[in-house]
């Protein structure tokens, strides 16, 4: 089999992380054109996961490229929708998106013999059964299109999106077992297969360090598959601009490309396009096209074991604090602006993120570390907001989540795994950690954060910061205008402005305006 398949390098997405711009669904087809013609992206992702995206957006995007540009969808610009999860949302919405993929391909056939849409993303993937089931739905829709309209298309191939730390640690096995199951179920295997890895949700559940290590472990494993299987595998890496969500921006590009070697495609999210300096997004796209993919440094069996135990230690230290902060996070997240048309947070039409099944991680950790990780997890789902608002909420009270649990975990790792393991963490496994913490320290204000923390929580966070100051010589000096805004954050003010209270409209507007201004200064909502 030829190994010359070139995967797209930059996928433009509809993530609602811009602090400066709201984009309605009817504007998104135009955004797709802008992504290709202005920013230089070679892939665009119409997003139906948790969003009120209309059925016909896939058709609109494909038609707009055909009618208004010289770019051929499926050749010059790759269109890759993200369908909803049949488990987390409902199967009807998933089938709706698949029907719209078929319709978009049918309409495009009139203008080109190139199929417009050839892949689709499946979110929050946990199992081979889920992947094969969704792929079978796509086969069924393709057969229905042939039966009803006499229209034959190549069945679009699923891209599983893996988003929590335990699943990321089993990404290689999931991809490998999927391809074996594919052969058994469909009688053949695809000659190329992409896997989408998400940084944000694993960070939300396990913290910044555990999330980064989990993603790198997954990248490492999937890269190993390329030398073991006939199917060529590619990796899409979903990252935002703030460190907690990946730290993908022009200023940090060199660190990012070194940190995540092996990734073939990056996401260009809304914050970088609309909230960063004009020209930054275009420059990053050019850089990514020149650099990706870079050869990964593969880990040894001993290093993998060490990484897993580090993930367990950092995840436990983070989780013990975050469960205490959940009410505050939810209250602030409720007041952050909605920058895309999302489905309702609760009920049958939408969903929030719930706690992952950690058994797959606990079983890999050393026994004592696994037990502490289990003990750190909340007894029931916290129903936290989505990752962007989660991150924005913590930044808005002067406590960037990158710091939570990190100092204490570093000390614990030194005690339990030894000095060499900590040295490996800082020089080999996660060399960008110092840079990430220095960036986040510009938005750290413990005096303000202390207003929202219990005495126990404040004690633990203060210890985190003391250890990190000693280890990294951090300079915690918030930008002056940001300091003024964050000083305005008072628990009573938030309570007055939160939804569900009889609020004064001016107070509510003041709180929302302040939160938005802080987002603009840090160049991302979250």
Swiss-Prot record:
GO biological process annotation, one example: tricarboxylic acid cycle
Cofactor(s) the record lists: Mg(2+)
Sorted UniProt keywords: Carbon dioxide fixation, Lyase, Magnesium
Catalytic activity, EC: 4.1.1.31
Lineage: superkingdom: Archaea
Catalyses which reaction(s): oxaloacetate + phosphate = phosphoenolpyruvate + hydrogencarbonate
Any Pfam family the entry gives: PEPcase_2
Any one GO molecular function term: magnesium ion binding
Record-annotated disulphide pairs: none
Complexes and interactors: Homotetramer.
Family: Belongs to the PEPCase type 2 family.
HAMAP family the record matches: PEPcase_type2
Role, per record: Catalyzes the irreversible beta-carboxylation of phosphoenolpyruvate (PEP) to form oxaloacetate (OAA), a four-carbon dicarboxylic acid source for the tricarboxylic acid cycle.
Protein name: Phosphoenolpyruvate carboxylase
Source organism of the structure: Methanosarcina barkeri (strain Fusaro / DSM 804)
Gene this chain is encoded by: ppcA
């Amino acid at each position: 089999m030829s190994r010359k398949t070139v995967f797209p390098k930059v996928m433009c997405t509809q993530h609602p992380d811009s602090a400066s711009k709201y984009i309605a669904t009817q504007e998104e087809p135009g955004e797709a054109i802008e992504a290709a013609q202005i920013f230089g992206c070679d892939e665009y992702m119409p997003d139906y996961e948790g969003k009120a995206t209309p059925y016909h957006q896939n058709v609109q995007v494909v038609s707009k490229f055909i009618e208004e540009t010289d770019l051929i969808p499926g050749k010059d610009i790759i269109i890759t929708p993200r369908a909803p999860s049949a488990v987390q949302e409902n199967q009807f919405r998933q089938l709706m998106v698949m029907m719209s993929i078929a319709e978009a391909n049918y309409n495009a056939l009139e203008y080109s013999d190139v199929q417009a849409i050839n892949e689709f993303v499946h979110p929050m993937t946990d199992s081979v059964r889920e992947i094969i089931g969704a792929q079978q739905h796509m086969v069924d829709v393709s057969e229905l299109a042939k039966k009803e309209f006499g229209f034959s298309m190549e069945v679009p191939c699923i891209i599983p999106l893996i988003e929590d730390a335990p699943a990321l640690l089993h990404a290689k096995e999931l991809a490998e077992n999927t391809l074996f199951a594919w052969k058994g179920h469909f009688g053949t295997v695809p000659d190329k297969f992409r896997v989408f890895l998400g940084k944000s949700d694993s960070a939300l559940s396990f913290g910044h360090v555990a999330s980064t290590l989990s993603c790198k472990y997954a990248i490492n494993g999937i890269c190993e598959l390329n030398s073991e299987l006939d199917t060529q595998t590619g990796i899409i890496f979903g990252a935002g601009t703030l460190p907690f969500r990946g730290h993908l921006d022009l200023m940090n590009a060199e660190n990012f490309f070194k940190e995540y070697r092996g990734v073939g495609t990056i996401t260009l999210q809304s914050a970088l396009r609309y909230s960063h300096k004009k020209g930054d997004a275009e420059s990053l796209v050019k850089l990514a096209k020149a650099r990706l993919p870079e050869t990964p440094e593969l880990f040894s069996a001993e290093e993998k074991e060490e990484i897993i135990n580090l993930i367990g230690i950092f995840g436990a230290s983070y989780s013990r604090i975050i469960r205490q902060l959940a009410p505050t996070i939810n209250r602030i997240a409720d007041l952050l602006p909605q920058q895309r048309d999302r489905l309702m947070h609760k009920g049958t039409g939408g969903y929030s993120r719930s706690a992952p099944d950690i058994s797959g991680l606990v079983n890999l950790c050393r026994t004592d570390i696994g037990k502490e990780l289990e003990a750190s997890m909340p007894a029931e789902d916290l129903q936290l907001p989505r990752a962007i608002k989660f991150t924005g909420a913590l930044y808005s009270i002067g406590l960037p989540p990158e710091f939570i649990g990190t100092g204490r975990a570093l000390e614990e790792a030194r005690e339990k795994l030894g000095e060499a393991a900590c040295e490996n963490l800082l020089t080999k496994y996660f060399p960008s950690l110092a840079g990430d913490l220095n960036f986040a320290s510009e938005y750290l204000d413990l005096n303000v954060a202390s207003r929202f923390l219990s005495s126990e929580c404040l004690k633990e966070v203060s210890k985190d910061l003391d250890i990190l100051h000693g280890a990294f010589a951090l300079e915690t000096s918030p930008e002056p205008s940001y300091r003024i805004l964050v000083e305005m954050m008072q628990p009573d003010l938030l309570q007055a402005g939160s939804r569900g209270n009889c609020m004064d409209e001016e107070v509510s507007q003041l709180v929302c305006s302040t939160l938005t201004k802080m987002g603009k200064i840090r160049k991302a909502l979250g």
